[in-house]
Design a protein with these regions (language model features):
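Conserved alpha/beta-hydrolase catalytic His-Asp/Glu region
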Residues: 148-198, 205
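Conserved alpha/beta-hydrolase "acid-adjacent" motif
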Residues: 222-228
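Short beta-strand/loop motif that positions the catalytic acidic residue
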Residues: 209, 215-217
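Active-site loop/oxyanion-hole signature of alpha/beta-hydrolase fold enzymes
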Residues: 52-93
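Conserved HGGG/HGGXW glycine-rich cap/lid loop of the alpha/beta-hydrolase fold
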Residues: 7-64
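Catalytic active-site module of serine/aspartate enzymes centered on a nucleophile-bearing elbow/loop
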Residues: 238-267
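Gly/Ala-rich beta-loop-alpha elbow adjacent to hydrolase catalytic centers
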Residues: 94, 98, 102
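Flexible "cap/lid" loop of the alpha/beta hydrolase fold
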Residues: 103, 107, 114-144, 189
Length: 267
């Protein structure tokens, strides 16, 4: 890991893959996701790409800023990172909340992006928002688990999971992570991130994106419904929309998804 000192915090970041100016990609992780937690996805990307990824503010080693962040702050952090790395133009990959930050970055700095991949995400505003995860924080554990299950995949129930062992493994992993004890600072950071997330809205600015754009979604996503990806597609000229068999984690559920994303980013 390396660090970058910003005015209000120290940003922790890491590089993966073989350095290659033609295959640079800036990766934005999802809600609550750190570099460490996202290594399976990052490592797969790094097999083909020159990856830069950071623990976004409020998460992981980067820690908490002194004030509540905005989506613009998350995009500004990324700009500071690529400027620090000396990257002029590069591809961007954003998944879930990371797709929201990627959109904010793309509408603010469209000239920097060569290709944009947006997975299981939403534009906000009139285009549709993802499930309000901040509302789950204070629910009883059983109710939070029930809603989180359907948010992952609207098909998930006991009968479905009994017949789909891979999906059962996904759910077991989600439940195991939910039992891990967190510090007061970690919990506060997650709340701060989700509070920024609830105000995400790039709907009226999506027309600023002109680079080749792939929008990918799962047909059974309860967090970021496929209709939200269709809305993004309608606002970005020349964009490509691909739908997959799966939910919020379709990139793991549908074997076609990851090769399609890699093919797009390396195209």
């Amino acid at each position: 890991m390396a660090t970058l000192d910003l005015p209000d915090l120290t940003l922790w970041y890491e590089r993966f893959g073989t350095p290659d100016p033609a295959r640079r990609v800036l990766v934005f992780n999802g809600s609550g996701a750190t570099i460490e937690a996202s290594r399976p996805l990052i490592d797969k990307l790094a097999e083909h790409l020159d990856v830069a990824v950071h623990d976004q503010r409020c998460l992981g080693r980067t820690g908490l800023p002194p004030t509540q962040p905005t989506m613009a702050d998350y995009a500004a952090d990324a700009l500071a990172l690529v400027d620090h790395l000396g990257w002029d133009r590069f591809a961007v990959f954003g998944i879930s909340f990371g797709g929201m930050v990627a959109q904010e970055f793309a509408v603010t700095h469209p000239e920097r992006i060569t290709r944009l991949a947006l997975l299981c995400t939403s534009p906000g505003g009139a285009g549709g928002s993802s499930y309000p995860l901040h509302e789950l924080l204070d629910l009883p554990p059983d109710e939070r688990d029930r809603i989180s299950l359907r948010n992952l995949d609207t098909r998930y129930d006991d009968a479905f999971l009994a017949d789909h062992p891979f999906d059962r493994m996904i759910v077991d992993g989600m439940r195991a992570r939910a039992t891990v004890a967190k510090s007061a600072e970690q919990l506060r950071g997650e709340r701060m991130q989700l509070d920024a997330r609830r105000h995400h809205d790039v709907w009226d600015r999506l027309g600023a994106i002109t680079c080749p754009t792939l929008i990918a979604c799962g047909d059974h996503d309860g967090t970021a419904p496929a209709a939200n990806s269709e809305a993004i597609h309608s606002r970005i000229a020349g964009s490509e929309l691909r739908r997959y068999e799966g939910g919020h984690l379709f990139v793991y559920q549908d074997r076609r998804a990851f090769p399609d994303v890699i093919g797009f980013l390396t195209g």
